[in-house]
Amino acid sequence: MSQSLRIVFAGTPDFAARHLAALLSSEHEVIAVYTQPDRPAGRGKKLTASPVKNIALENNIPVYQPENFKSDEAKQELANLNADIMVVVAYGLLLPQAVLDTPRLGCINVHGSILPRWRGAAPIQRSIWAGDKETGVTIMQMDIGLDTGDMLSIATLPIESTDTSASMYEKLAGLGPDALVECLADIASGKAVAEKQDDELANYAKKLSKEEAKIDWNDSAEHIERCVRAFNPWPMSHFAIVDSSSNDEKSIKVWQTRVDEESTSAPAGSIIKADKTGIYVATGDKVLVLEQLQVPGKKAMSVQDILNSRASWFEVGTQLS
């Protein structure tokens, strides 16, 4: 058995909470948890604790929620914990060098991609968006750069042709905790080997925007199909269509599509066929088949259900924008 480490855990969302749960079941001791301050959530905008805070409180672990680490008090508070190592998973706050240097073994981070391929805020989404065939989690020794630290462990899995960001999130949330516990065992026993990243292979996974999720029908069908999966569950790929009965423009969210290899001379964005198998739309090259859509005020529905109630919106020749 490896040496037990005194761990400070820093994280905020559910993805991080699953890693914390794994640490609590390991031989290591989680002596404190850092998470972002409670935020307003829901219709009532009630202050809500993070998933990480909830797990910490359930296990009687002290919780710290600084707005940042700029003050000497916040830094000293961490130093007083006398931690061996700090584990950071989707914390959401920048850690200055003084914080990175505080634990005896420094700080390690679980990152949701194979570094250095995708550094930054949205690696899961960007890997699908780019058509990558695999992704994974990288555990790295943190430095002051953005996901630039030396790599301690990489665990990989394939990206399937039907995977969305939501499904990959679940897969990585299952992969990461085991990889983290194994990596900590290597660190505790002195077996961990750090590998420098090749900066020339790095890409920046910038945050997603609603504007980016608007479909450009001049793109290739394959790229649009990947965008639909990458932007699910947020911000959701969408297009605009005019309701012929009211002449109002409606925003339609796209949940599921497939590529049809058929080529067409129809203008990009025009509907060339609509039946229970899908709504067939011309793109910059092939045909994209819309299979599941969401109209304003409704839940996502199959195209067959959409056409039963709103066939006039999706007549052949209609131009989507």
Curated annotation (Swiss-Prot):
<protein>
    <recommendedName>
        <fullName>Methionyl-tRNA formyltransferase</fullName>
        <ecNumber>2.1.2.9</ecNumber>
    </recommendedName>
</protein>
<dbReference type="InterPro" id="IPR005793">
    <property type="entry name" value="Formyl_trans_C"/>
</dbReference>
<dbReference type="GO" id="GO:0004479">
    <property type="term" value="F:methionyl-tRNA formyltransferase activity"/>
</dbReference>
<comment type="similarity">
    <text>Belongs to the Fmt family.</text>
</comment>
<dbReference type="InterPro" id="IPR041711">
    <property type="entry name" value="Met-tRNA-FMT_N"/>
</dbReference>
<dbReference type="GO" id="GO:0005829">
    <property type="term" value="C:cytosol"/>
</dbReference>
<dbReference type="InterPro" id="IPR002376">
    <property type="entry name" value="Formyl_transf_N"/>
</dbReference>
<dbReference type="InterPro" id="IPR001555">
    <property type="entry name" value="GART_AS"/>
</dbReference>
<dbReference type="InterPro" id="IPR044135">
    <property type="entry name" value="Met-tRNA-FMT_C"/>
</dbReference>
<keyword id="KW-0648">Protein biosynthesis</keyword>
<keyword id="KW-0808">Transferase</keyword>
<dbReference type="InterPro" id="IPR011034">
    <property type="entry name" value="Formyl_transferase-like_C_sf"/>
</dbReference>
<dbReference type="InterPro" id="IPR005794">
    <property type="entry name" value="Fmt"/>
</dbReference>
<dbReference type="Pfam" id="PF00551">
    <property type="entry name" value="Formyl_trans_N"/>
</dbReference>
<comment type="function">
    <text>Attaches a formyl group to the free amino group of methionyl-tRNA(fMet). The formyl group appears to play a dual role in the initiator identity of N-formylmethionyl-tRNA by promoting its recognition by IF2 and preventing the misappropriation of this tRNA by the elongation apparatus.</text>
</comment>
<dbReference type="Pfam" id="PF02911">
    <property type="entry name" value="Formyl_trans_C"/>
</dbReference>
<dbReference type="InterPro" id="IPR037022">
    <property type="entry name" value="Formyl_trans_C_sf"/>
</dbReference>
<feature type="binding site">
    <location>
        <begin position="113"/>
        <end position="116"/>
    </location>
    <ligand>
        <name>(6S)-5,6,7,8-tetrahydrofolate</name>
    </ligand>
</feature>
<dbReference type="InterPro" id="IPR036477">
    <property type="entry name" value="Formyl_transf_N_sf"/>
</dbReference>
